[in-house]
Curated annotation (Swiss-Prot):
CDD domains: DEXDc_SecA (cd17928), SF2_C_secA (cd18803). Its main location: membrane. This is Protein translocase subunit SecA. It is a peripheral membrane protein. Its cofactor is Zn(2+). The lineage of its organism: Bacteria, Pseudomonadati, Pseudomonadota, Gammaproteobacteria, Enterobacterales.
Amino acid sequence: MLIKLLTKVFGSRNDRTLRRMRKAVSLINAMEPEMEKLSDDELKAKTNEFRARIEKGESVESLIPEAFAVVREASKRVFGMRHFDVQLLGGMVLNDRCIAEMRTGEGKTLTATLPAYLNALSGKGVHVVTVNDYLAQRDAENNRPLFEFLGMSVGINLPGMPAPAKREAYAADITYGTNNEYGFDYLRDNMAFSPEERVQRKLHYALVDEVDSILIDEARTPLIISGPAEDSSEMYKKVNKIIPHLIRQEKEDSDTFQGEGHFSVDEKARQVNLTERGLVLIEELLVQEGIMDEGESLYSPGNIMLMHHVTAALRAHALFTRDVDYIVKDGEVIIVDEHTGRTMQGRRWSDGLHQAVEAKEGVEIQNENQTLASITFQNYFRLYEKLAGMTGTADTEAFEFSSIYKLDTVVVPTNRPMIRKDLPDLVYMTEAEKIQAIIEDIKERTANGQPVLVGTISIEKSEVVSRELTKAGIKHNVLNAKFHANEAGIVAQAGYPAAVTIATNMAGRGTDIMLGGSWQAEVAALEAPTEEQIAQIKADWQVRHDAVLAAGGLHIIGTERHESRRIDNQLRGRSGRQGDPGSSRFYLSMEDALMRIFASDRVSGMMRKLGMKPGEAIEHPWVTKAIANAQRKVESRNFDIRKQLLEYDDVANDQRRAIYTQRNELLDVSDVSDTINSIREDVFKATIDAYIPPQSLEEMWDIPGLQERLKNDFDLELPIAEWLDKEPELHEETLRERILAQSIEVYQRKEEVVGAEMMRHFEKGVMLQTLDSLWKEHLAAMDYLRQGIHLRGYAQKDPKQEYKRESFAMFAAMLESLKYEVISTLSKVQVRMPEEVEAMEMQRREEAERLAQMQQLSHQDDDAAVAADLAAQTGERKIGRNDPCPCGSGKKYKQCHGRLS
């Protein structure tokens, strides 16, 4: 009560922020007559004037009123569009390192031109981030005339572009691209072998469109660049044959139900667990297939990879559904993004899941991959000096933006008041009744000439609705991941009178639905339209537009609630743009995933007690509240997962930053001989210490062992025993100095053969290659550690603290291993002529190029619950004899800590 009273008196934080910014808007409006008087050339010259002022020490913030006034005037001249005052407010919010919540149709694309221009004046570059390639290209091409009029260059960063084209795009003042491509370019730059191969500049200002989709929906999925591992496709096929013999246990959590099933599914946590009965059957079937020996256990250390295959196959069959989670196209399994409904070409699930799905669908199984580099969006976007974003729906996630990204959310008012009617939810007992009610609603509304957009949560559901509409004889368009090439065209005409459009979550985000359809699309379809044709098209459109307004505007039907209220709001936001009329309603059934998993059985029990007949719906505030609570539960669970992922990834992030900084320093220098000399001393000291303990008696020295080690690891044959026999006065310190001096002498002789320049080149190549190889193995070891670390909780230890402690020890061991491997490689390599060194360098580059071609870019399904699932199935995951040792030494497990066990 007191808070409400204080808010009434002083206004909310949002109100106070907008009040402060409105003063600047008044200044910009006051400058408008002055800007209108300037000629085109004088207006263009303002850009160079602003740049000169920044170089003299003026801050970018002090230029806001003038710069925004210049962009507004340029927009009037180039596009014939004037920024509204609310768009100026939005631009200031975006410059203020905040999230601007602007409703659909309020002109976010035009708003973005203001902060993009302002922050590009410093010459450090601006990255505008969009959710897909189509929007990146569209926005870049749409805004290019404005920016080029003001003397700014525009670049587009698309997947598959050659490195020179990417460098050119990043060198532009303003670069448009997708979140994935920016992230992958960052990882690729940190795998480059020369400074010339890098494409990105220092990360300065990122302006993220649909910021909720990128920083929240996709935050759980790290970007991973991986290379091929060994082929195990046959094993996936064999295990896949066994899974159909297993029966799902329906109600494992019931006290009275005696389960007959072989595995249980936890839909909430997306986990699959074998029951005791299932384990016995699986072991019998594996023995029958000749995969496992009789009497062996699936949980024995030797079968841990087999358990991995069984778990992956079980998850593929029980949790992943065709046309919901993925589609099969041209013999390839393509992931469907659960949040946008778009296909993710080239992306693959990790942990063998993608191969298991390929086996299930009977398509060619591609090799498993090994992680070469990875980063989460959370950590990538926090690398920018300045970050801001805009979306139509951010307020529900304001706490997460603030706690993880330190970004405040500011709700920007609409230009015209919103008059859309959001009708209460209707809840039916069954899916069939719900679909029938939707069809009736569509019939009724289209009869009045009202356009309808039907939002579904998966391709499968969109096709179910489509089939029913076809049966009812209702003409309609379908927009889902299978047909997304037509996306913009379908969305542009979804506002036609009586048009019916079915869309998955992709729902053409970024494309406005114009009431009466898009006259611009009709004009664009003509080859060389005359003025008369354009005038006629506009006149026809006006008639249609008025008819749709009279019918009540665009009606939105949601076929079920999404896990997140924000995505429901996005669907609703397709209607009622720019003060247009519109309406929306969600239809639910007790068979919907959200209701089944989160709304308790009491709701359906209550509905039966109320004596509901087939086809009847319940419309009650209590039910709406229960649904909102269910959504809140899912949102908070997903937030916890993202937060937990970030806390674990922060540990890896510190290490990643250290490695990438060291690697970039290496790339930027041509001579690393000082570093080599320094680490040679460390390596030889540590090696000699193992055989001649410091300040020890001569009887404790292992001279034969030391001689053998120096010969095997450093190609250094030294008669140490002979020296000690002939020179009794030779003590420990002088012996150490002599061994090091001999190693330096041998190395210098090699250098004399090939020349100093070639040797420096070779040293740098060896250091980079060794660093990359060990970092790759370290990432795999960190994955192993991460998957089993939650089990430490049973020993009353904090898994996060244990993970920090052990990963730090592994990192320190990796750095020691790096020194050793570099000196060992440089000492053992036999070089004769400069041509041979050049040939070796060529071979290394060819290998790097081959690997680059085989790299997979993937979104890992790194839900904390999924990681825990695999670890819980396998116990603390055992390491194969030929796997890299988790200690980070770079050696195989059997040659390192495997000896101890």
